[in-house]
């Protein structure tokens, strides 16, 4: 389950921000996760709850926003939506696709006290 190490990385970012900006508690974390990232949102919530115990983010609500997958189709010369990494172009049926979006994961915003 790679979500555990990802959740630990998110907590590290939060703790670094808490030291830098002098806040004591995080109440909400907004996390953007790309549809093609391979991250399971339910597993991420579970792991986040586990790793944030006894931290500035203990009890924080994790809000996950899913970013759509996109790719550049070399045959169509168009940006197209993608539901899976090795899918085919919805316009021409081709497989010459370069993923351009939906693989990222980032902390978008923190609500703090």
Curated annotation (Swiss-Prot):
Gene Ontology MF annotations: nickel cation binding; zinc ion binding
Alphabetized UniProt keyword annotations: Metal-binding, Nickel, Zinc
InterPro entries: Hydgase_Ni_incorp_HypA/HybF_CS, HypA/HybF
Top-level taxon: Bacteria
Record-listed Ni(2+) binding positions: 2
One Pfam short name: HypA
Any one GO biological process: protein maturation
Amino acids binding Zn(2+): 73, 76, 89, 92
Similarity comment: family membership: Belongs to the HypA/HybF family.
Function (record text): Involved in the maturation of [NiFe] hydrogenases. Required for nickel insertion into the metal center of the hydrogenase.
PANTHER family, A to Z: HYDROGENASE MATURATION FACTOR HYPA
Protein name as it appears in the record: Hydrogenase maturation factor HypA
Naturally occurring in which organism (per UniProt): Albidiferax ferrireducens (strain ATCC BAA-621 / DSM 15236 / T118) (Rhodoferax ferrireducens)
Gene (name only): hypA
